[in-house]
Amino acid sequence: MHSKVVHTIYKVLHEAGHPTLRFNFRGVGQSAGSYSGWDGEVEDVAAAAAYARERTGSGPLWLAGFSFGSWVGSIWALRDGRVERFIGLGMPVSTNIDGRTFDYLDRPPAPMLIVQGSRDQYGSREAILALAERLRAKGPVEVRFVEGADHFFTGHLTQLADALRGGLGLGAA
């Protein structure tokens, strides 16, 4: 929740007038509980979405996730079906976490924007482009690379914000 990447997407969406909610998964930061092997983390996304809905009403639900959050968020979005826009940042598609890969993603969970550092250690340009190509057969997917950025967009947060604004139609290209 306190990562610079999460703060950047929060700021971009908040400045555009979108209600926003940031949260930590169980056992992260001051959140109670401990890592539960995915199912609990997917439940955390569901609980956060329900909380946001209670507070904001029935407007469009956009879901953004960074790194592990993009993975878990996309699982929940596929199951739930109410997400109107999915934003994946620093998607770790070149990584195997607990024996899992992004192979489960057989369609975009919603119209999808992927923003990735061109030098991301956990999701190479080639792997991201292959994922996007596979998903485009079943729905809209846009990919934007932040040139020179690593997984954490170190030194490239302004370019990350610009890529988000451009990809979401909020200004800047």
Regions from the PLM with identified roles:
Residues M1-S58:
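Serine-hydrolase catalytic machinery in alpha/beta-hydrolase-like enzymes
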Residues G33, A149-A161:
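Catalytic histidine-centered segment of alpha/beta-hydrolase-like enzymes
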Residues P60-G65, L89:
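Short beta-strand immediately N-terminal to the catalytic nucleophile in serine-hydrolase-like folds
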Residues G65-G73:
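Gly/Ala-rich beta-loop-alpha elbow adjacent to hydrolase catalytic centers
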Residues R82-S94:
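A conserved short beta-strand
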Residues T95, S118-G123, H151-F152:
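Acidic catalytic loop of the alpha/beta-hydrolase fold
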Residues E133-F152:
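Catalytic histidine neighborhood in serine/cysteine hydrolases
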